[in-house]
Amino acid sequence: MENNEPVVETPEAQNDLPEVERLKGEVEFLKAELEASKNKFLRLYADFENYKKRMVQELEAAQRNGKFDAVRALLGTLDDLERALGFASVKPEDLIPGVRSVLENFTRSLKSLGVEAVPGVGAEFDPRYHEAIGAVEGEEGKVMHVYQQGFKYGDLLVRPARVVVGSGAKPEEAEA
């Protein structure tokens, strides 16, 4: 049996039509807003990926430039050492002023790179910068001898100074 009767809309169904149209409009608006947000996210993601790549490149360039500056600062010392070898046939005592000059230039080069010597003889022993390798009679807690110079780069310790530290008063002073 077929139902060929025309569909008659009830007044309630007619009242729902404006609501359906409003909801369709809201759905379209939300779809457009979602698409805009998605596009914004994709642009931000691409920008962030480009930023990460740029930061890696800048870090590599900074490291390369730092090494370049260090090499350039030390080339003068290399030149001085090569000149000193040219005087190898000279008496050893005649080489001392030249070697001293090379040492001074090398120290200046290190200082230009921000490298400084750790305080040595006469300084208070500081375990942050000194490594005690022995003790001798002398003022307690003072560095008496530097076996190997220590260096720091800013706040970073490159190498501790290996030192001999004073152990206290001499025996004859203690008895008096």
Curated annotation (Swiss-Prot):
<comment type="function">
    <text>Participates actively in the response to hyperosmotic and heat shock by preventing the aggregation of stress-denatured proteins, in association with DnaK and GrpE. It is the nucleotide exchange factor for DnaK and may function as a thermosensor. Unfolded proteins bind initially to DnaJ; upon interaction with the DnaJ-bound protein, DnaK hydrolyzes its bound ATP, resulting in the formation of a stable complex. GrpE releases ADP from DnaK; ATP binding to DnaK triggers the release of the substrate protein, thus completing the reaction cycle.</text>
</comment>
<dbReference type="GO" id="GO:0051082">
    <property type="term" value="F:unfolded protein binding"/>
</dbReference>
<dbReference type="InterPro" id="IPR013805">
    <property type="entry name" value="GrpE_coiled_coil"/>
</dbReference>
<dbReference type="InterPro" id="IPR009012">
    <property type="entry name" value="GrpE_head"/>
</dbReference>
<keyword id="KW-0143">Chaperone</keyword>
<dbReference type="GO" id="GO:0051087">
    <property type="term" value="F:protein-folding chaperone binding"/>
</dbReference>
<keyword id="KW-0346">Stress response</keyword>
<dbReference type="GO" id="GO:0042803">
    <property type="term" value="F:protein homodimerization activity"/>
</dbReference>
<dbReference type="Pfam" id="PF01025">
    <property type="entry name" value="GrpE"/>
</dbReference>
<dbReference type="GO" id="GO:0006457">
    <property type="term" value="P:protein folding"/>
</dbReference>
<dbReference type="GO" id="GO:0000774">
    <property type="term" value="F:adenyl-nucleotide exchange factor activity"/>
</dbReference>
<comment type="subunit">
    <text>Homodimer.</text>
</comment>
<comment type="similarity">
    <text>Belongs to the GrpE family.</text>
</comment>
<protein>
    <recommendedName>
        <fullName>Protein GrpE</fullName>
    </recommendedName>
</protein>
<dbReference type="InterPro" id="IPR000740">
    <property type="entry name" value="GrpE"/>
</dbReference>
<dbReference type="GO" id="GO:0005737">
    <property type="term" value="C:cytoplasm"/>
</dbReference>
<keyword id="KW-0963">Cytoplasm</keyword>
